[in-house]
Regions:
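Conserved small/polar residues in nucleotide/adenosyl-binding loops
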Residues: 166-173
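Charged, amphipathic alpha-helical linker segments immediately N-terminal to NTP-binding catalytic cores
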Residues: 145-165
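Acidic-residue sensor for enzyme active/binding pockets
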Residues: 15-17, 144, 172
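Conserved catalytic-core motifs characterized by acidic clusters
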Residues: 3, 133-136, 157-158
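Noncatalytic partner-interaction/assembly domains of nucleic-acid and motor enzyme complexes
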Residues: 1-112
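Extended, charged alpha-helical coiled-coil/arm scaffolds that mediate oligomerization and mechanical coupling
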Residues: 86-142, 152
């Protein structure tokens, strides 16, 4: 019986990644929502991870996050010109009809990131089993630890939340 060859592409959604970034440019509240859920490594397409980190950096410094400041900061960071171009950044804003759905877009990005991490973890476990140097018990222990570590990252990008924002949240409750 022949197995069908399946072209495997790592899980990702270009549209969701673009929508998260576009929403963050459009709305300061979307920045907070996105940074609570994501880290730059969650983006499959590197350019959006770079934009994400740059916007978080601007936001954490209390600077406006708009087309001009973002483009200027990207140029300072010496990123590739295609990422720092005004057209590239502006196209992200025009691609998003509303920032109201940023949480949904961010969840898609996060889910795909977790899928990629699970695939990588599965490959590591598979390789351990094929190599056969460790006992089954040791491989099981390593697997359990790695799965637990992965589960602990589900919460998102809490590392980016500024102290002032945390302080405000504490007073709201």
């Amino acid at each position: 019986m022949e197995e069908a060859l399946v072209k495997r592409i790592m899980p990702n959604s270009l549209e969701a990644e673009q929508s998260v970034i576009g929403s963050m440019i459009m709305d300061k509240d979307a920045i907070v929502t996105a940074m609570e859920m994501l880290i730059s490594e969650d983006f499959y397409h590197t350019q959006y991870g770079i934009l994400f980190d740059t916007m978080i950096e601007l936001y954490n410094k209390g600077l406006p996050v708009d087309l001009v400041t973002l483009q200027n900061k990207l140029k300072e960071k010496d990123v590739p010109p295609e990422i720092a171009s005004l057209e590239f950044v502006r196209d992200l804003v025009t691609a998003v009809p509303t920032s109201a759905n940023v949480k949904y877009y961010a969840q898609i990005v996060k889910d795909n990131s977790m899928r990629r991490k699970l695939i990588k973890l599965n490959e590591e476990i598979e390789n351990e089993c094929y190599v056969g140097k460790e006992s089954v018990e040791t491989v099981m222990d390593i697997t359990e630890k790695k799965v637990f570590d992965l589960l602990s990252t589900r919460g998102g990008g809490g590392d980016y939340v500024p102290v002032s924002y945390t302080h405000l949240r504490a007073h709201e409750t």
